[in-house]
Amino acid sequence: MPLSPDDFIAELWTIARQVPMIEHPWFKGIIEHRWTREQIVLGEVQHYLRVRTNPIFFGYIAVNAVSEKQYGLMEVVLDNFMEELGGERTHVDIMLQMLEEAGISRAEADAADAAPGTTAAIEMIVGGCQRRSALEGLALLSFVEDQHGGASGVAAQVYRSLIGHYGFSPRAAETYQIHAEQDEGHGGRQIDAIRRFAVTDSLQEKVRQAVQLGVNAFNFEWDGHVQAMTGVREHWAGVGALALRQPTGAGHGPSLRSAKT
């Protein structure tokens, strides 16, 4: 029997909160002023390498919504697509503003090696949006974007630190201002779509797996920022034990339990 929309969203938040954005060393280090300006620029090169794939995976979500005749989802998909890619400047263009201020050209950024975490994130996000339904693609992004946006969200706090402590110009840090303004709406609309459309057992399971994929993928991306800054292959473990549904051996199917004992 499917969960109620409220109970299902609450369950999905428990997945996202295993690796909360605000606690990841990339964001926390900026907010608490533990990284140097030079390290942040190296991390932002990795950010750029992932963001330049936005048109690819948003395109897959849009195409899937049309091919699936998911008319109710199309408005959400197109709103997000236009905010990300429409207008005179895309998010990729805005990302480049910080790199340009640091003396890094687009050609130099394009030639940079992706860190292990960055590579994993790109493959997981692009592949996930290509091979899964439009609803699953939105779910993959939703709980990360919802944490990013808003006046008290991660992006707003990072923006204040970049401007106030590190001395980046508003133009250089603009990508975080835009995330603060737009991502709360993106995430909220996507979560509302999950409430509306994920109403069967099978759809809820697909969305559950997509959210897990997205949470892991973006966590890998931020690991990639830190890997590029430090030169160390490290993976952030999150704030608690890894919760996985695993067989119990009692013949009753999988149950949710910690992987650590």
Residue ranges and their predicted role:
Residues 1-261:
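Non-heme di-metal
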